């Protein structure tokens, strides 16, 4: 069942927010939002609400793992953010619902205009009452000259089970287009029973010290973080098992040798944190998928099932 709430007001707002001159900024921009509400009925997770404004929406849910756990693809037809664009995604899972959310392609934040209008993306995910939530988007590419800001907020409870990752590529080295100017800020917050549990903020300027210093990106162009919680059964043992399995993975080891992939696996109490640096996105994606395959059975109780869209 898919109930979409498209009111006359939303349709009017969509027309108002199509590309054109903004009364607020004077810039050409999109302002788009997507609100999802999922619940469980008769052992089936359904998309109860999918309300959108602007060029942001979802396809119908796919159920490759059965009725309990849909895969939901979030679509942004323009493909990227230009000057003044703002995107907000809100998803709430209720009453034991389960879901995997992903995107079909890389997100992009393009060069801004001469006035430096910011491009902003905010994702708020509430899984406090959910059985499980997975947020596994494709990478975000930050173009030279962008003025981007991204925020991820996870609202959880002590009983929550979730895996979330973000991968960010600064510039396009393969096209000889490094991130030489502009700025990018990325904030990740986790609330646990409404109290702060995890906070991380990355603030970079083109060719600033954060790119080369040991405390920063160490000369790499791509970075990512994977967060998995909450591990109730021997979190330190689970962490060590995951670390040893990744170290023994010959495919991951080869990426470190040939692609300069660097990673570290730590934990904050029962929250497991995997961080990675590289010159390319693909090695980090492979690392995260390997970690996801290891952590998913322990946290969610099922084997990994990659979304079909990843293979296209």
Swiss-Prot record:
Alphabetized UniProt keyword annotations: Chaperone, Cytoplasm, Nickel insertion
Region (Disordered): 1-24
Record-level GO cellular component terms: cytoplasm
Entry keyword Cytoplasm: yes
Top-level lineage group: Bacteria
Pfam family of the protein (one): UreD
Localisation: Cytoplasm
Compositional bias annotation for Basic and acidic residues: 1-15
InterPro entries on file: UreD
GO molecular function: nickel cation binding
Assembly behavior: UreD, UreF and UreG form a complex that acts as a GTP-hydrolysis-dependent molecular chaperone, activating the urease apoprotein by helping to assemble the nickel containing metallocenter of UreC. The UreE protein probably delivers the nickel.
Function noted in UniProt: Required for maturation of urease via the functional incorporation of the urease nickel metallocenter.
Record-stated family: Belongs to the UreD family.
This protein's name: Urease accessory protein UreD
Organism of origin: Hahella chejuensis (strain KCTC 2396)
């Amino acid at each position: 069942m898919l109930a979409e709430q498209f009111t006359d007001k939303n349709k009017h707002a969509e027309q108002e927010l199509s590309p054109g001159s903004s009364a607020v900024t004077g810039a050409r921009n999109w302002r788009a939002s997507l609100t999802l509400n999922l619940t469980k009925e008769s052992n089936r997770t359904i998309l109860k609400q999918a309300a959108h404004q602007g060029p942001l929406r979802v396809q119908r849910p796919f159920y490759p793992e059965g009725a309990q756990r849909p895969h939901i693809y979030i679509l942004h037809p323009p493909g990227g953010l230009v000057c003044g664009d703002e995107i907000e995604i809100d998803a709430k899972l209720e009453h034991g619902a389960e879901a995997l959310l992903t995107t079909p392609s890389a997100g992009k934040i393009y060069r801004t205009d001469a006035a430096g209008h910011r491009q902003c993306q905010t994702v708020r995910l509430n899984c406090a009452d959910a059985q499980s939530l997975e947020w596994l988007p494709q990478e975000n590419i930050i173009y030279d000259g962008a003025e981007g800001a991204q925020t991820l907020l996870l609202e959880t409870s002590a009983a929550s089970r979730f895996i979330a990752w973000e991968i960010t590529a600064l510039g396009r080295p393969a096209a000889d287009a490094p991130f030489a100017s502009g700025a990018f800020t990325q904030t990740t917050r986790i609330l646990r029973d409404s109290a702060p549990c995890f906070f991380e903020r990355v603030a970079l300027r083109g060719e600033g010290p954060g790119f080369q210093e040991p405390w920063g990106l160490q000369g790499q162009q791509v970075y990512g973080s994977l967060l998995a919680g909450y591990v109730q059964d021997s979190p330190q043992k689970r962490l060590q098992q995951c670390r040893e399995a990744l170290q023994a993975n010959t495919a991951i080891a080869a990426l470190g040798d040939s692609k300069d992939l660097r990673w570290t696996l730590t934990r904050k109490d029962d929250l497991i944190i995997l961080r990675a640096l590289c010159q390319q996105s693909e090695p980090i994606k492979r690392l995260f998928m390997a970690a996801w395959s290891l952590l998913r059975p322990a946290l969610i109780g099922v084997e990994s099932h990659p979304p079909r869209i990843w293979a296209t």
